[in-house]
Amino acid sequence: MKNQKIRIRLKAFDYKLIDQSAAEIVDTAKRTGAVVRGPVPLPTRIRRYDVLRSPHVNKSSRDQFEIRTHQRLMDIVDPTDKTVDALMRLDLPAGVDVEIALQ
């Protein structure tokens, strides 16, 4: 797999979980002899929702909720076959979304 790179993008609501998963991926890739760039923290997406507290009147009284989506990006440069196999067998927590692209 010469002159290729694997781009991994992680998304999660909990920043501790995403940092732990990123560290696990970096350790696995380095153990197999690949060069890792990252993890690079991408901007956190904040979705805010305003909900009326009362079902009838009092429009000025609202509850505010938000969901924060944390993201990390990392590149694995010149991965070996060992690296790909190790990443396939890696078990990450359920709250982390992983997108892998081969470039």
UniProtKB/Swiss-Prot annotation:
GO molecular-function terms, A-Z: structural constituent of ribosome; tRNA binding
Pfam family, one: Ribosomal_S10
GO cellular component: ribonucleoprotein complex; ribosome
SMART domains: Ribosomal_S10
Keyword hit for Lyase: no
Biological process terms in GO annotation: translation
Entry keyword Ribonucleoprotein: yes
Domain of life: Bacteria
Keywords for this protein: Ribonucleoprotein, Ribosomal protein
Record-linked InterPro entries: Ribosomal_uS10, Ribosomal_uS10_CS, Ribosomal_uS10_dom, Ribosomal_uS10_dom_sf
Subunit structure: Part of the 30S ribosomal subunit.
PANTHER family listed in its UniProt record: 30S RIBOSOMAL PROTEIN S10 FAMILY MEMBER (PTHR11700)
Function (record text): Involved in the binding of tRNA to the ribosomes.
Family: Belongs to the universal ribosomal protein uS10 family.
Protein name: Small ribosomal subunit protein uS10
Organism, scientific name: Bordetella petrii (strain ATCC BAA-461 / DSM 12804 / CCUG 43448)
Taxonomy of the source species: Bacteria, Pseudomonadati, Pseudomonadota, Betaproteobacteria, Burkholderiales
Name of the coding gene: rpsJ
